[in-house]
């Protein structure tokens, strides 16, 4: 598994990006309309990314998206529907990233 989108029906609860994910080119995982962007920049040593600004985009935000990076160890994450029903439990390892988008969540270290 490199990238896994976890849904409850049509509702995206989270996206998990495992440490093994190594794109060969610059790639953004999240769609442009997301308030939180996750991207991987791939360039050769010495390459410069020119200073730039992101254009202002007016958005309506419902909820609080979170990005968690597992720096060490393992974490068991349980993802819940908006009705507080368990959808799935996953193990995240060192180097994994999870973007929590909707629904609920709990953690066990």
Task: Annotate each language-model stretch with its function.
Residues 11, 18-19, 55-57, 93-97:
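A short, sequence-level motif marking secondary-structure junctions
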């Amino acid at each position: 598994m490199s990238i896994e989108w976890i849904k409850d029906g049509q509702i995206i609860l989270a996206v998990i990006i495992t440490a093994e994910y190594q794109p060969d080119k610059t790639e953004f995982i999240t769609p442009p309309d997301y308030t939180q962007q996750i991207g991987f920049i791939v360039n050769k040593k010495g390459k410069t990314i020119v200073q730039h600004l992101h254009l202002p985009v007016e958005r309506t935000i419902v909820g609080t998206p979170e990005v968690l990076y597992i720096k060490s160890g393992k974490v068991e994450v349980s993802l819940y529907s908006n009705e507080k029903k368990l959808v799935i439990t996953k193990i995240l390892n060192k180097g994994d990233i999870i973007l929590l988008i909707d629904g609920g969540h709990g953690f066990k270290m």
